[in-house]
Amino acid sequence: MSSLWVSALSLLLAIVLAAIYASVINDVTDLAGDLEAGKRNGVAGRSGLMVATLVALTVGAGFLFAWLWRDDALLLSCYLATWLAFSLYSLPPFRFKERGAAGVLCDAAGEQLFPALVAVFLACRGAQRAVSGAWVASVAVWALAYGLRGIVWHQLTDVDNDRAAGFRTFARRHPRAAPGIGTYVVFPLELGALAAMLWQIGSAWPPAFLVLYALYAVRSARRWQTAPVIVVPKPRFFIVLHQFYSDLFPVALLITASVRDRRVLIVLAAHLLLFPRRVIHAIRRLRASTARTVVNASEPHHGGVG
């Protein structure tokens, strides 16, 4: 159990470091364009020394994790690939951010694909279990597809600012194709991979939470007049499945693991303590959704003409 705790903490710290690095270098390389477009930038007004120190500290700490994992080729490769993807996306002369499809692939790989694979390999390492090829493939397709959907949505949302700043992103280069690819190619791949993951998990908990999320999404759309969005931004919207992935799926997985090994209850408790607000809000919304569904189902239907 202690090795799983170490793995979980290592994953959290290692990915946070990479995320900080990605955010800083993206702001640094976008600074001139953001100022021209009147867009907020995180490093605007900061001293160059402070920014350079932050980058150096995150890179140094990241290499420490790489050294600790040097004996695990798959884990090390995926972790280093996370940093490489972020670097290729933002830094010249590569700057894949402005190279169309290469940019969205790079961002999705750095934000979702490689961190998800790091989590898989690290969990197997901590549990001292063999890695399942089918599980790795399912997680990889799901994470990459979700990452692609996220970056396409972001670029479509930010297209006016990118135009003002002169950034030629995938959404700017292909304004008609981007929504269609995200909706009719990427999203079905994401759903198929998610279904494969749920089948391999072999527990009723994640599908049950998914059904509850669907009830909430339908009720939310009706009650608050919000629009479900796959990739195309709309006024008063919510991104389909985002809250399930961020709030409910982790809890469902931990409950599943707790049923199989009661020691995991400690990890579940730690998760609830670390992210209480998200979990509480999700539970309240789901409870309200299911209650409303039950009430509607129990009410008699008054038919008639007129």
List the predicted regions and their residue ranges.
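Extended hydrophobic alpha-helices typical of membrane-associated regions
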Residues: 105, 206-306
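C-terminal ends of transmembrane helices
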Residues: 27-28, 32, 85-100, 151, ...
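Acidic (Asp/Glu-rich) catalytic motifs at the cytosolic membrane interface
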Residues: 14-42, 146-171
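Core segments of transmembrane alpha-helices
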Residues: 54-62, 107-120, 180-194, 242-252
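Intramembrane alpha-helical segments
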Residues: 44-128
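Membrane-embedded alpha-helical segments that form the functional core of polytopic membrane enzymes
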Residues: 1-25, 73-87, 129-153
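Alpha-helical transmembrane segments and their membrane-interface exit regions
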Residues: 16-18, 81-91, 142-148, 211-223, ...
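Multi-pass membrane catalytic core of lipid/isoprenoid biosynthesis enzymes
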Residues: 13, 31-80, 167-209
